Each structure stands twice: as structure tokens, then as C-alpha cells.
């Protein structure tokens, strides 16, 4: 490999990325390691993380405020797509990776870096997401992946960092790997690697336990315009505020925990714990509003598109032609997704109890009612059923003769 003199490293302050700084300098002989810290609304003191990078040997450390872009360009499209990987996971971590990769490439261009680097391990999904996004946006840039090459366990990585005076953010006795952004938290490793071991309560931070959540339910209304959430309880909010408020409301009532077996891109199954209260709540409400504003065939086909959309994002193809085409289809369905959805939060549940679309509802009470106001023409049903089932009737007659 041609000698790299300057590299931009995606930096979080965690075990792997912290160890990457001395590793890149000492093992690769790179003179300048510039770190990029993405502000994704994780609520950490990013200035401390920036200083940690500098103290670990980085020549420069850059903080990028990506919160608004993260919500508007990534989270909101996921809501429109009702994105749930394996029908459970709303891609809270996966959505952040292409945005970080995009900024890595942009910074590399600005400072004339030879390469970009990340601290993803060789068995995770994030390595795929970073590499595919970087290759799509900066195919000429080298990608350096120390954690994929050094073959160190998490414990060994901690010890390596300690040799260079880098304190680990986790204890050796409780080595959870936690990723946090505005959309949620992902927790793995430690005792969670036993799929039968119940996740301890102390790993959760965004959601209350069912026992500690309020005894009385809370009813809320979520307002949508063109498929985007725009308000909660008659209060119109900007995109970031929508996510923040949804997180607080759903989290307080214990909604938004996911404990699942996940099929990783690299072919293995992994036990994952997620907290995504606001995003799950908004997807649930959005899907419900579509049930009253979209035609049945559109809903049916959009379900196929949604599944593929979620797979593409999970597998790292955010910047790809199929994803772009699916985006166009989804956007075309959302002009009529306007209205409000009422949800009851209680003891870990979010139960839809109402939905309305003043201008785009396909529900006709005068057709659906069983009261005297019914305008449905019942006499047409017999002819409809005769034609609807004709092919099946012919098949049945033919096969009954064969049996005789």
C-alpha cells in the first residue's frame, strides 16, 4: 500500500476508535491523524471527546454538528418508509453511518488527506456501511481499518490503549459496547452475548421499566404532513424537536425497547438490544395514518418496498441506485399522508386509538356504517361475488369430477 501521510478518522472516543490513533501512527507510520467527531444528538460532552483525541495523539480534532441533517435527511425518510429491519429494528444506528461517511469524505477533500479510517471490527455491520458509503462518495480515497486488521479482542484493545495512556470508557468487568445518537441506543457485548440472559435493567437509559412507568395512561396526538411528523398534541415542532419530544413521551411510559436476534450483513446472528422510543412511536403512527389515506394496492406494494428499503439501509446501500429509486416511489405515495393519529401510551405499549385525515381520508362512514344511514348497495354483492369467485368455482368443478 502506498504510504499514507494524512488520514481522517471517524472518532467516537470509544475503545476501538481511541486505540486507532496510536495504532495508525505507530503501526502504519502515518504522521497526521485528524479525527472527526459527529454530533448526532448523543448528549455527550463532545469537547471532552475532542480533547481526548488530541491527548491520544491526533494532530487535529473536528466536531461536526449533524443533528438537523441526521433527522431531516435520514430519520424522516425512514419514518416515511416505515423502516423496520426484520420487522423490529428501526435502523437507528444504521442511519447514522452514511452521514458520518459523507462528512469523512468531505473533510478528506478539504484538508487533502490521503485516506479515511474507521474503528469498525471485522464482524460488525458498520464496517460494511462505512466502506460502501465511502466508496460511493470518494472512490479514489483509501480506507484504513485498523480494528479489522489487528485481530485484538475488546479486552486486548483496552490493554493496548492503556499502554499509550488512553483510559477506556468501559470497565473490564462490564464491557458493554454502546452506541448512542438522538434516535436511540444500541447495546451489545458482555452478558448480552448469551441470548437467554435477560438484559439487566441498568443498561437502559432512554426508557423506563414497566414497573417504574406511570400507572395512568397518556393519550397523545401526532400530526403528519406529506408523511412527515410535524407536531405533537397540537404543538407544531421542528424535526429535531419532534424526535426529542417523542423520545421523552414514549420513553417515560416504557415504550421503545427491542431485544432481538439480528441477522448481520457478514452472515452471523447477533443478539442486539435497542432503545428507540421516539422513532418507533412515529413509525407506528405514520403507518396507521397510511391505512386511512392510501389505496389497498399501494399499501400492499409499499410493504414490499419498505422491506427492501430497510434491507438496503441496513446492508450499507444508502448511496445506491435501487435505494434512490425506492425513495422516489415512497415520496410519490406521501402527498396524501396528512392527518392526525391518537396513541395511548401505557406500561410499555403504544396503542393506536384513533386516526383522522380531514382532506385525504379514503374512509367513508356512510359506506362503512351498519346504521340506517348506510348508502352501500347491498344488492350488488351477489353479482360481485359470482364474478370474483368464478375461476375458483370452475377449478372446484373440474377437480371434483376427477375425484369422482
UniProtKB/Swiss-Prot annotation:
Amino-acid positions noted as binding L-aspartate in the UniProt annotation, renumbered to this chain: 121, 125-126
Protein name per UniProt: Argininosuccinate synthase
Catalytic function, reaction form: L-citrulline + L-aspartate + ATP = 2-(N(omega)-L-arginino)succinate + AMP + diphosphate + H(+)
Organism domain of life: Bacteria
Organism annotation: Prochlorococcus marinus (strain MIT 9312)
Pfam family, one: Arginosuc_syn_C
One example GO MF annotation: argininosuccinate synthase activity
Assembly with partners or alone: Homotetramer.
Lineage start: Bacteria, Bacillati, Cyanobacteriota, Cyanophyceae, Synechococcales
Amino acid at each position: 500500500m502506498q504510504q499514507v501521510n494524512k488520514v481522517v478518522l471517524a472518532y467516537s472516543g470509544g475503545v476501538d476508535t481511541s486505540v486507532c490513533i496510536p495504532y495508525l501512527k505507530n503501526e502504519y507510520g502515518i504522521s497526521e491523524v485528524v479525527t472527526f467527531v459527529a454530533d448526532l444528538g448523543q448528549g455527550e460532552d463532545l469537547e471532552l471527546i475532542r480533547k481526548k483525541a488530541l491527548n491520544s495523539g491526533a494532530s487535529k480534532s473536528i466536531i461536526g454538528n449533524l443533528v438537523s441533517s441526521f433527522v431531516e435527511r435520514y430519520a424522516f425518510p425512514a419514518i416515511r418508509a416505515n423502516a423496520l429491519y426484520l420487522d423490529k429494528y428501526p435502523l437507528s444506528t444504521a442511519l447514522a453511518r452514511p452521514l458520518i461517511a459523507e462528512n469523512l469524505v468531505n473533510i478528506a477533500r478539504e484538508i487533502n488527506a490521503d485516506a479515511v479510517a474507521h474503528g469498525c471490527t471485522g464482524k460488525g455491520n458498520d464496517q460494511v456501511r462505512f466502506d460502501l458509503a465511502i466508496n460511493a462518495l470518494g472512490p479514489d480515497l483509501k480506507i484504513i481499518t485498523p480494528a479489522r486488521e489487528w485481530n485484538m479482542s475488546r479486552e486486548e484493545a483496552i490493554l493496548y490503549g492503556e499502554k499509550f495512556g488512553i483510559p477506556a470508557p468501559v470497565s473490564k468487568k462490564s464491557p458493554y459496547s454502546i452506541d448512542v445518537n438522538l434516535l436511540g441506543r444500541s447495546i451489545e457485548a458482555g452478558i448480552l452475548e448469551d441470548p437467554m440472559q435477560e438484559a439487566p435493567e441498568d443498561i437502559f437509559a432512554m426508557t423506563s421499566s414497566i414497573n417504574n412507568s406511570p400507572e395512568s395512561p397518556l393519550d397523545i396526538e401526532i400530526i403528519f404532513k406529506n408523511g412527515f411528523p410535524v407536531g405533537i398534541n397540537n404543538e407544531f415542532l421542528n424535526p429535531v424537536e419532534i424526535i426529542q419530544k417523542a423520545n421523552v413521551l414514549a420513553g417515560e411510559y416504557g415504550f421503545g425497547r427491542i431485544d432481538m436476534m439480528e441477522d448481520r450483513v457478514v452472515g452471523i446472528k447477533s443478539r442486539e438490544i435497542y432503545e428507540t422510543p421516539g422513532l418507533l412511536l412515529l413509525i407506528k403512527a405514520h403507518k396507521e395514518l397510511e391505512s386511512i389515506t392510501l389505496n389497498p394496492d399501494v399499501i400492499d406494494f409499499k410493504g414490499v418496498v419498505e422491506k427492501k428499503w430497510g434491507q438496503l439501509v441496513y446492508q450499507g446501500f444508502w448511496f445506491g441506485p435501487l435505494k434512490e429509486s425506492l425513495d422516489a416511489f415512497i415520496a410519490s405515495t406521501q402527498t396524501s399522508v396528512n392527518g392526525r393519529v391518537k396513541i395511548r401510551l401505557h406500561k410499555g405499549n403504544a396503542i393506536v386509538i384513533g386516526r383522522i385525515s380531514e382532506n385525504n381520508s379514503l374512509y367513508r362512514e356512510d359506506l362503512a356504517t351498519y346504521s340506517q344511514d348506510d348508502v352501500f348497495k347491498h344488492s350488488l354483492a351477489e353479482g360481485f361475488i359470482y364474478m370474483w369467485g368464478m375461476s375458483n368455482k370452475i377449478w372446484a368443478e373440474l377437480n371434483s369430477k376427477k375425484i369422482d
